[in-house]
C-alpha cells in the first residue's frame, strides 16, 4: 500500500527451472528495494543452467485497490498455457479444519486423549464447513505416527490414526457436500516422499480424496536445499505434476 488509492505488487511469472526472487532493502537507502535470487547450498551459485535458458518474468502490478491486484490477468498471461486439455478436476476452493488448535496446544497431533484429528472432531468441522459453504476440511495429524523423516515417522500417509475412521469421515463429508483434504507432512524429507508418493496418491484417487496439503516443516529440503532455490522450485513443479497424474488438487 502506497496510499489509500495506490497499491503495488512486485512478483514474477513463469518461474521454471530457476531460483525464486526475493526482495530486500537496498543498501542505497531511500526506500528502494534490491532483488536477489535464493542460492544453492554453497550460497554462491544461484542458478545452474546451460544457455540458452529462459529466465522468469518480473512483474509490477499497480491498482487503486487490493482487489484490483487480484483481478489482474498479468501473471496468468505471462505463464505458459495449461498443458492439460481437461482440467475439470481442478477445484479452487476454501478449507477449514484441524490445524490451528494443534499450534496453540488445545489439541495434539499424535494420538491420545487430546488428539485433534479424531472421527467426532473432524465430523464437527465438516458440519461447520457445510453450513458456511466451505468446500474442504483439512485434518492435520489424521494418519498414524509422526511426520515423515522423524522418529516413528509414517511410512505411507495412508493408515489413519486409531481414533479416526477414515471411510466414515470421507463418506460423511460427501453426504454433506464437503470433501476431506489429506495432509502429508514430509518434514522436508522429500527424497523419501518421492519413493512413496505414487502409492499414496493412487490410494487417494481410489478413495475419492481429491485434495492434499503437503507440509515441508523443518530446515532445508532433503536437509540441504533452500525451500525457494532452483532445486526447490523444480521439486515443487515435480510434485504438482505428480498429483495431476492422479487428479488431485
Could you describe each region identified by the protein language model?
Residues 1-82:
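N-terminal accessory beta-strand-rich subdomains and adjacent acidic, glycine-rich linkers
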Residues 45-48, 124-126, 200, 239:
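Generic recognition of flexible, low-complexity loop/linker segments
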Residues 1-2, 8-10, 57-61, 96-98, ...:
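Generic structural hydrophobic/aromatic packing signal, biased to beta-strands
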Residues 50-127, 132, 136:
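An acidic-aromatic substrate-binding cleft motif
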Residues 140-249:
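Aromatic- and carboxylate-enriched substrate-binding clefts and catalytic-loop regions
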Residues 12-14, 63, 100, 141-143, ...:
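A mature extracytoplasmic/lumenal domain signature
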Amino acid at each position: 500500500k502506497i496510499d489509500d488509492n495506490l497499491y503495488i505488487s512486485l512478483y514474477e511469472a513463469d518461474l521454471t527451472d530457476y531460483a525464486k526472487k526475493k526482495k530486500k532493502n537496498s543498501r542505497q537507502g531511500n526506500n528502494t528495494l534490491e532483488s536477489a535470487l535464493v542460492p544453492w547450498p554453497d550460497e554462491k551459485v544461484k542458478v545452474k543452467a546451460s544457455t540458452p535458458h529462459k529466465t522468469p518474468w518480473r512483474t509490477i502490478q499497480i491498482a487503486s485497490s487490493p482487489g484490483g491486484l487480484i483481478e489482474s490477468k498479468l501473471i496468468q498471461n505471462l505463464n505458459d498455457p495449461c498443458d492439460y486439455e481437461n482440467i475439470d478436476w481442478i477445484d479452487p476452493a476454501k478449507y477449514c479444519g484441524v490445524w490451528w488448535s494443534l499450534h496453540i496446544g488445545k489439541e495434539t497431533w499424535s494420538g491420545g486423549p487430546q488428539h485433534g484429528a479424531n472421527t467426532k472432531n473432524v465430523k464437527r468441522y465438516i458440519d461447520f464447513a457445510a453450513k458456511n459453504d466451505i468446500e474442504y476440511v483439512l485434518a492435520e495429524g489424521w494418519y498414524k505416527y509422526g511426520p515423515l523423516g522423524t522418529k516413528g515417522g509414517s511410512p505411507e500417509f495412508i493408515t489413519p490414526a486409531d481414533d479416526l475412521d477414515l471411510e466414515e469421515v470421507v463418506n460423511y463429508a460427501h453426504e454433506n457436500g464437503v470433501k476431506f483434504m489429506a495432509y502429508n507432512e514430509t518434514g522436508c524429507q522429500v527424497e523419501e516422499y518421492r519413493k512413496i508418493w505414487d502409492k499414496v496418491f493412487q490410494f487417494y484417487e481410489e478413495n475419492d480424496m481429491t485434495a492434499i496439503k503437503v507440509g515441508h516443516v523443518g530446515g532445508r529440503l532433503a536437509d540441504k536445499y533452500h525451500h525457494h532455490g532452483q532445486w526447490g522450485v523444480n521439486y515443487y513443479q515435480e510434485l504438482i505434476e505428480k498429483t495431476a497424474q492422479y487428479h488431485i488438487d
